[in-house]
Every structure is written in structure tokens, then in C-alpha cells.
Amino acid sequence: MTIGIVGRKSGMTRIFTDDGLSVPVTVVEVDPNRITQVKSVETDGYAAVQVTVGSRRASRVSKPEAGHFAKAEVEAGRTVLELRNESGEQFEVGGLLTVEAFEAGQKVDVTGASKGKGFAGVIKRYNFRMQDATHGNSLSHRAPGSIGQCQTPGRVFKGKKMAGHMGAARVTTQNLEVVRVDVERNLLLIKGAVPGAPGGDVIIRPAVKSRNNG
């Protein structure tokens, strides 16, 4: 059992089962995660493991970060992330988290930054239907329609679905299946799509919800 791991989305491909079925999979490159800090309830108020992955030029590492990595005796990585440790499993600073902790058939939750779409209208952003293309409709074909009432309440309620920035947000896709674990090449093949663009960092954790497929 593992608390999770940080990887990099490489892209999508497909593999074939023994029955000849084509299964779309996302390839996630998971280099060993180096543990830079172990947080506990007694000292930090919560239990977590701080990890880094990849590499970074020394000129791009600030002095506080350099001291932090030196204390843990690990190489500076491209990012630093935390994984909550609610299982009570024991970890040591300087240790490694690897793909060996996962197994084929396991369900996982994958968190990443979704693709940024920029400023988008309500049709693209929220799947609103378009208004009539003709029959007296002018310049309102992709408009949202009414956004509220009149003098009472005299305002637009918070959370009203309107045009705005779409994507580039933290997204989690739940209950994805690990199809294959390639320990030699540090790869995880996960069924279906995971959030984000190729090259983006993703966090892979054991699924928190169990789905009954029966």
C-alpha cells in the first residue's frame, strides 16, 4: 500500500488484452520520488510526506530551498509536493517512493492541472444550448440569456454560470484502473484519460471511493 506518487504525463496510447480488445491508456512517467521531509501530527498538526522529483539546475534553486534539500541529503527537483499520510505508514527522509508500490488492476485517483482554454463563453464552458439562429434573434445566438431578476434582489447571485476563464485548474479524476506497471522503465499505464497536457505533473493516489461495477 502506498500514499501516492508524483509523475509526469507522457501521452496516450493503447494496449491489447489477451482477448484482442483495445484499451486506451495514459502513459505516466514516474521517476523515483525523493522524500525531503516527513511531517507528523505532533510537530506539524497533520501527517504528510513531502517529496521532490526530477532535477533542476543549481542556479534555479533559491538558498532556502538549497538548504532544505541539503538537510534531507537529496538532489533538488523540479517541484516539491506533499502527500497526506493517513495510513500511519512510516517513512524516512531521503527515502524513495517508486512505482513498485502499485500493481495492475488497482484503482487510483489522478490529480493534475487541466488544460487551459482561456476566456470561454457559456456554451463551451457550461454546455449551454444555443439560442435560435433566426426567427427574430439578433446578436444573441450564443448569449446566456437572463442572469437574474429585477429590483428584487437587485443583484446577480454568486456562482451564476457566466463566461470567464476556463481550464488551468486543479482537477481530480477518480477510480481509474492501473492497467500495467513497468518497473524497469518507471512507467504506469492508466486506463483512460488523466487531467492535464502531456509533460504536466500529476499526483497518483490510491482511490478513496470504491465503485461497485457489478
Curated annotation (Swiss-Prot):
Membrane-traversing stretches: none
GO cellular component, one term: cytosolic large ribosomal subunit
Modified residues (N5-methylglutamine): 151
Alphabetical list of PROSITE patterns matching this protein: RIBOSOMAL_L3
GO molecular function, one term: structural constituent of ribosome
Keywords: Methylation, Ribonucleoprotein, Ribosomal protein, RNA-binding, rRNA-binding
Biological-process GO terms, alphabetical: translation
Post-translational modification remark: Methylated by PrmB.
Subunit composition and interactions: Part of the 50S ribosomal subunit. Forms a cluster with proteins L14 and L19.
Family of the protein in this entry: Belongs to the universal ribosomal protein uL3 family.
Function in brief: One of the primary rRNA binding proteins, it binds directly near the 3'-end of the 23S rRNA, where it nucleates assembly of the 50S subunit.
PANTHER family, per the entry: 50S RIBOSOMAL PROTEIN L3, LARGE RIBOSOMAL SUBUNIT PROTEIN UL3C
Protein name, per record: Large ribosomal subunit protein uL3
Source organism phylogeny: Bacteria, Pseudomonadati, Pseudomonadota, Gammaproteobacteria, Cellvibrionales
Gene name as annotated: rplC
